[in-house]
């Protein structure tokens, strides 16, 4: 029985559960549920605070977990990233009062408020910078206005909250974060990991690709296939109409409309695009 930790709340929770459902796993219907047994797939899900997930996995209490890359690195737990999951993307940035024109080198001796002391301390130590870290549990944006800190380091998605509090970003991002699948860094990988990983990878591919079908004359077939090479090769079948072929290929979702325009210009017709519900590659 595979034991997997899932965020119980926050920005990662709903997206994680949605991905797991798309991968064929049962998920809780009541947010008060803390444990759910999916007997069909042989998985037991535990809904935990996102910040605690890396600790449970690192200690070997649970086999796998879904959490943020920022929280994994901040925890210093004995856990490693298996694969990125494509949601919950954010950047970890430094910010100061608007107009302060600070640089990274000027952080020496300053008060720096953050909810991620482990992550920030490691980043600064690698660069020989010694700031006074002040750990806060959320609402870091108000620390400068309240006189608690000179600068902050926090997760930034749009930057709207920072601007509303009179702050501006400076320096390069400390980290590009997103939701990740993790397992313990020591010992043998848990049984069932590869199947679970393949299912999630199938969801990612299904989200990022579509299936494209079209008919094209033999004279334009090579050019059309160059536009739709697929993962290995497009599927090409002769039609009853002499000189015409049917083509099927996976194409990147974001490029589908542009590819359709080019195919039409080549003379392709009956161009259809359908979603991919699931796949294994």
Language-model features, listed with the residues they occupy:
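Short, structured active-site "lid" loops
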Residues: 42-61
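Small-molecule-sensing regulatory modules
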Residues: 1-42, 47, 67-80, 85-91, ...
């Amino acid at each position: 029985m595979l034991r997997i930790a899932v965020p119980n709340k926050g920005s990662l929770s709903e997206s994680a559960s949605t991905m797991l459902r798309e991968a064929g796993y049962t998920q809780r219907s009541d947010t008060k549920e803390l444990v759910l047994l999916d007997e069909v797939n042989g998985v037991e899900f535990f809904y935990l605070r996102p910040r605690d997930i890396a600790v449970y996995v690192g200690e070997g209490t649970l086999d796998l977990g879904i959490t943020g890359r920022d929280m994994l690195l901040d925890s210093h737990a004995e856990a490693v990233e298996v694969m990125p999951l494509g949601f919950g993307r954010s950047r970890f940035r430094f910010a100061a009062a608007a107009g302060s024109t600070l640089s990274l080198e000027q952080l020496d001796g300053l008060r720096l408020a953050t909810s991620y002391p482990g992550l920030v301390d490691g980043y600064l130590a690698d660069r020989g910078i010694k700031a006074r870290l002040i750990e806060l549990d959320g609402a870091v944006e108000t620390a400068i206005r309240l006189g608690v800190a000179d600068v902050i380091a926090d997760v930034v998605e749009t930057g709207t909250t920072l601007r509303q509090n009179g702050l501006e970003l400076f320096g390069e991002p400390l980290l590009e974060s997103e939701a990740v699948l993790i397992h313990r860094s020591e010992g043998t990988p848990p049984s069932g990991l590869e199947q679970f990983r393949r299912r999630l990878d199938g969801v990612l591919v299904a989200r990022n690709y579509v299936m494209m079908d079209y008919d094209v004359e033999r004279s334009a077939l090579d050019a059309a296939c160059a536009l739709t090479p697929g993962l290995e090769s497009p599927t090409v079948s002769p039609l009853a109409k002499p000189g015409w072929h049917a083509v099927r290929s996976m194409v990147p979702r974001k490029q589908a409309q542009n590819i359709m325009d080019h195919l039409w210009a080549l003379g392709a017709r009956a161009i259809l695009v359908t979603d991919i519900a699931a796949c294994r590659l």
